[in-house]
Amino acid sequence: MVSESCSRNYNHPYTPYDIQIQLMDAIYNTIENGYKIGLFESPTGTGKTLSIICSSMTWLRTFKRNNTFLETNNEVEDVYESESEEDEPEWVKKAYQSSIVNRSKNKLIEYEHYLDKIEKEHAQNKRKEEELEIKVHKRRKAMTAAGTDLSEESYLPMDYYSDSEVGKIEDQNLAITKEINRLLKKVENKEEVSYINECPIKIFFSSRTHSQLNQFSSQLRLTNFQASFEDLEERTKYIPLGSRKQLCINEKVRSKGNDQSVNDACLDLQRETNGCQYLPKNYMMSSVTKEFADLSLAKIRDIEDLNELGIELNICPYYSVRKGIEMTEIISLPYQMIFQDTTRKILNLDIKDSIIIIDEAHNIIDVITSMYSIKITSDQLNKVIKSLKIYLNKFLKRLNSGNRINLMKLIKICQILLKFLNTNSEKVKSGDEVQIQDIFKDSTGDLVNIHKLDQFLTKSKIAYKIESYIEKTEMETDNGEKKGRITNSGGSSSSSSSSNPLLFTIIKFLRTLTNLSKEGKFFWDNENGTISLNYMLLDPSAVFKEIVDQAKCVLLCGGTMEPMSDYMDYLFPSVPTNKINTFACGHVIPKENLQVFPISQWNDTNFEFSYQKRNDSKQLMALGEFLIEITKRVPYGVVIFFPSYKYLDQVLQFWRDTKILTSIESEKTIFREPKDPSNVEKVLNEYGYLIQTERKGAILFSVVGGKMSEGINFSDDLARAVIMVGLPYPNAYSGEMVTKRKYIETSELSNGGTTTDAKEKSRNYYENLCMRAVNQSIGRSIRHINDYSIIYLVDRRFSTPRIQNKLSQWVKERISITTTNNNNNNSIYIMESTTDFFNIIR
């Protein structure tokens, strides 16, 4: 429903719906009323991103406007205290205060005019170049192994001097350089526009994917907010932050496949005599850097725009964008940048008193856990040891003693880990805990200082050098043909993979050995017969606490946040409940546009797709018959979700053998979600073309947790029905799940809980993982106010209050309850309701 009125002016570019106003009010009030945490669920398709932008930016501009007087009043008091003139008349103080406000306002006006001017000049220059057909390509041509004969010297690491004076001198020089830069920056800041220094409170918007962050930029372009002063036009100061891989414009560096290699290649290039052609010495003092920063603030630009701007100005976007951070009001950035303290320090991101917004937060616990977790296998270790030996044999005589000794130590540690894996692989089971001392038992590994070895790996950047050399040798064969290098994905590729090379994985694992914490555990896992040694962060609240403590307010937003209890239990257990505000809004669609049917049985067959019962042939036949009837009644697209690829394959094979699939195919063309993510787009395009262009029916068999359930939107005819088969519980016997549940139970007992309490909390955690996946999958179908669909939840457990209470609010309130105890009547009722639904709504 479109709202007639709004509680306050949020400067929404459109007339907001009631639920959008409710969400904006909830966000604004959470910040304004001093809550530390806000949890917000707003279904996908309800304009969530715009609501977040409008409420948070309206609060920020209101805060800046209301606090100008307070800040200038404090400044006046400081001036009079320092000058010992407290007896000045009040009217003199007010006049002085007014002059400061006016000067601040005038400086802001001056800066706004300056940004207008440089953006206009930039646009004019760009047009002239286009008219003259001058193509500005400042990038270097990619230097590939095939096209350029790189000197073997380029594969040597920097000389490493362990505990030597040379190392100390280098560290001292680095410290001196940093201090000089700090002082220069201080002087420069004095010379720049005063009274409009950095924004007092910043908004950090973080999301999972590059496309989601780009969508945020595009939504921000639609908005225009009240100024910090009256009678002033003030643009939104926004900067998107990205990785080197996204922002680097040096093709020599960009050509490296993965993030870590790009990072190391960039730093390696800077150490060379001539450095990088796009990064001037003392770049923060460069006028071109300042021009880049000012232009980046002059209008809303996304990552691609910054990349293009860097090419036009011949300056590095990755480093230059930092120049504008102080003036920025709102910054978008990927999860890794906000959650890793070291990354925030490198980027000089001060989150103190800031507003931090985490979008798509339904998976945030898993994201933080995976960022600080790692596993290794014997196959990986064998490949790394082989690569290290090849490299050492090649460059042995050219390596200095520090590099040579530490490389041998690295090989030794890898061999110890390999022996430990091979020795125990036959007698361990998933979830068995591993003690560090057991790894080095009966070996000399404990004599190796792993912390110093880590310092060597970090400072020498040798992992990147070895990876580059091995990649070169593997890309060359005697007949000149190319073959792919082996990466952490386990496969090979003819081009650089996005997966991290194995050596980086092993190094990350070694670092967990040097930074042991009570929040993590080492354990065994057995996945499809492959034994791995794992480290897992068990308490993500330790990472999240630092952010919560520093920030003014942390807002977690998502389309499917239910069940919300996990966030309170595992992300911020130390935050008092009166400092946490929760809100779940309904959907923009009319109530009659969505029906939800829990399907407990079909005719006289009960549905329960538990691990023990899911292969029952009678049940699979009944599911097939149910699906045939659905495909007859639902127009155009039907999307059906199964718990796993393996189970989907089993069901499809059963239906082929029993001719069920033939009957389904007579009603709708069948599509199946591919296991290879690179083929997903092709399948989706074919599925969409058949429905939207040829106006035919199709059914898409998908998997919970796959690409279809996470990032794909099935709007309009693409999903007139969504079917969820069973409850997609994760594997209860995986090493990760066994270790996590054991940790939850132990923690509950140590906090004074009973054994029953501990088991219930562990069960809740396991169940909530399942239900968040359900909510995420079924939320794919409704994308806008005029959309309509039916959701079928096929399993008797979906009819229980315990499970229904964990569905998203907008789904739960639309559940259709069948009152008859007759199975056949229930089946008839559901089919008749389906037919009536589409007859009426169409």
Curated annotation (Swiss-Prot):
Instruction: Print the keywords alphabetically.
Output: ATP-binding, Cell cycle, DNA-binding, Helicase, Hydrolase, Iron, Iron-sulfur, Isomerase, Metal-binding, Nucleotide-binding, Nucleus
| Superkingdom classification of source | Eukaryota
**Region listing for Disordered, in residue ranges:** 476-499
Tell me the residue numbers annotated for binding ATP: 42-49
Question: Could you tell me where this protein is found in the cell?
Answer: Nucleus
Family of the protein in this entry: Belongs to the DEAD box helicase family. DEAH subfamily. DDX11/CHL1 sub-subfamily.
Q: Which Pfam families match?
A: DEAD_2, Helicase_C_2, ResIII
Tell me what organism the protein belongs to. Answer: Candida albicans (strain SC5314 / ATCC MYA-2876)
Record-linked CDD domains: SF2_C_XPD
Binding residues for [4Fe-4S] cluster: 248, 266, 276, 316
According to its UniProt record, where is this protein mainly located? nucleus
- EC category: isomerase
GO molecular function ontology, one term from the record: ATP hydrolysis activity
Where exactly are the transmembrane stretches of this chain?
none
Q: How is the cofactor bound?
A: Binds 1 [4Fe-4S] cluster.
Q: Which reaction does it catalyse?
A: Couples ATP hydrolysis with the unwinding of duplex DNA at the replication fork by translocating in the 5'-3' direction. This creates two antiparallel DNA single strands (ssDNA). The leading ssDNA polymer is the template for DNA polymerase III holoenzyme which synthesizes a continuous strand; ATP + H2O = ADP + phosphate + H(+)
Q: Which InterPro entries match?
A: ATP-dep_Helicase_C, DinG/Rad3-like, DNA/RNA_helicase_DEAH_CS, Helic_SF1/SF2_ATP-bd_DinG/Rad3, Helicase-like_DEXD_c2, Helicase/UvrB_N, P-loop_NTPase, RAD3-like_helicase_DEAD
User: Where's the motif DEAH box?
Assistant: 359-362
* Designated name of the protein: ATP-dependent DNA helicase CHL1
Domain Helicase ATP-binding, chain residue ranges per copy: 6-417
Q: Which GO terms describe its cellular component?
A: chromatin; nucleus
